[in-house]
Regions:
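Terminal RNA-binding accessory module
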Residues: 1-72, 76, 109, 361, ...
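Rossmann-like S-adenosyl-L-methionine
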Residues: 2-7, 12, 18, 223-460
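Residue-level signal for inorganic ion chemistry
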Residues: 24, 40, 83, 199, ...
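Short, conserved phosphate/pyrophosphate- and ester-handling motifs at nucleotide-, phospho-/glycolipid
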Residues: 40, 164, 287
Length: 460
């Protein structure tokens, strides 16, 4: 019998789903997904939707809390939804992430590979170096920052997001006060009226430099000189103030035109010793300290020797490969985004003549470039793969096998596609030695992982 809407069930939460919801089973065996619950919770759950083989519910009453449950220290954690695991002890969160990665490699990849304990983030809160606040109005009609409630474009005001450094929250609130005092209107999606759509902020984890970028419907910003003066007086680490223009009716945050009100238009920072310049469009890991831990694992798994050639596919701004440039003879990077390749070349140049001389970066589709390089006879000793969430296509993986590197290191933001690709490589002569989950997104369900693969059989 299907579950009925508003039906109440007493359920025990067994595990977490991929989106962080608790998973339980009805007496008839139907899976029920319940946000805001933890494994071990006994709860009264209200059914909101039955989809046949599974259903969705909400927590109506917590009967017996899980030992892994902790008090939630954010008033809007529920409606905001940005911290889907804020109610769980961090050690339990890490265990859950390890189990999720292990399940993907076992169930999707069919691989019997050691999945190590998840490495924690050095910072559990205030770890993000980037924030994109939509700008709306609070219940009194005043401009406010916040985040969209799940599956809506309704802004939940959030003056102090626990994932952002305090100074970024302070800047967002100060800007809203400036908007209110100067009659600057937030953008309204329904009417298409208003000026300010988003507040986009970056902060260098090591440099402390801050970029302020206001996403607006037009380039001319009223009281711009006064705005810059007020920001610089209150926040001395601000290095750039920008206007990004997005006049389209779209969910895409940034537009194509950016105007500088103050500073060079970017901030500077370092990642594993690699100097980087970050503008509004730069793709960059949002948790710098945990990313350095991730790259350290990747370097360890690469086992580079001084005579080696390293091929870095999906290289982005070149940070992974450049962080290992002193360990190899030659570095070749491939990335499809032109701006990222320009940044990679500039980053290499800033590291000095020796690194610049041994580094080559190409703007191309990773799979097509890999196939071309393989056909040209390139035989790198180590290949680094860091694909988007969809993973690698078969063209890329086939080219990797054709180039026959001694080792392959696969960095992934999606354990499911990583497991699939690792299984393909196993079928074509590579051995998955181990998988290291690394937590770059505490308080959320997301987890990165690094896979070490070697050519042929290895001693157990």
């Amino acid at each position: 019998m299907p579950l009925q809407k508003n039906q109440l069930l007493t359920l025990r939460i067994e595990r977490l789903s991929s989106d962080g919801s608790g998973v339980a089973h009805s007496p008839e065996g139907e899976a029920v997904f319940v946000p805001g619950t933890a494994p071990g919770d006994e709860a009264q759950v209200r059914i909101v939707k039955d989809c046949g083989r599974y259903a969705f519910g909400i927590l109506d009453k917590l009967l017996t809390p899980s030992p892994d449950r902790i008090p939630v220290d954010c008033a809007v954690a529920g409606p905001c939804g940005g911290c889907s695991l804020r109610h769980m002890d961090y050690a339990a969160e890490l265990r859950s992430k390890q189990e999720s990665v292990a399940d993907a490699f076992r169930r999707i990849g069919g691989l019997d590979v050691p999945v190590l304990d998840a490495l924690p983030s050095p910072e559990v809160d205030r770890y993000r170096n980037k924030v994109q606040f939509p700008v709306g109005r609070d219940k009194n009609g005043a401009p406010c920052i916040g985040f969209y409630a799940g599956r809506t474009h309704r802004i939940v005001p959030c003056p102090d997001c626990k994932l952002q450094p305090g100074v970024l929250n302070d800047i967002g609130n100060a800007l809203c006060s400036f908007f209110a005092s100067h009659g600057i209107q937030p953008y309204d999606e329904e009417s298409g009226k208003g000026l300010v759509r988003h507040i986009f902020l970056r902060r260098g984890a090591h440099s402390g430099q801050i970029m302020v970028c206001l996403v607006c419907t037009r380039p001319k910003f009223p009281h711009s000189e006064e705005l810059v003066t007020a920001l610089r007086e209150q926040f001395s680490d601000i290095a750039s103030v920008l206007i990004n223009v997005n006049a389209k009716k779209t969910n895409v945050i940034l537009g194509e035109e950016t105007v500088s009100l103050y500073g060079p238009g970017y901030i500077e920072d370092t990642l594993c010793g690699v100097p980087v310049r970050l503008g509004p469009l730069s793709f960059y890991q949002v948790n710098t300290l945990a990313a350095e831990r991730l790259y350290g694992i990747a370097a360890e798994y690469a086992q580079l020797e001084p005579s080696d050639v390293l091929l870095d596919l999906y290289c982005g701004m070149g940070t992974i490969g450049l962080s290992m440039a002193d360990r190899c003879r030659e570095l070749i990077g491939v990335e499809i985004v032109p701006e990222a390749i320009d940044s990679a070349k500039a980053n290499a140049a800033r590291m000095g003549d020796a690194v610049a001389a041994k580094s080559r970066f190409f703007c191309a589709d990773a799979g097509q470039a890999a196939a071309r390089l393989a056909a040209e006879g390139l035989r790198p000793d180590v290949i680094m793969l860091d694909p988007p969430r969809k993973g690698c296509d078969e063209t890329t993986l086939s080219a990797v096998v054709q180039m026959s590197p001694r080792r392959v290191v696969y960095v992934s933001c999606n354990p499911s596609t990583a497991a699939r690709d690792a299984a393909w490589l196993e079928e074509h002569g590579y051995h998955a030695e181990k998988v290291q989950p690394v937590d770059l997104f505490p308080r959320t369900r997301h987890c990165e992982c690094v896979i070490a693969l070697s050519k042929g059989e290895i001693d157990s």
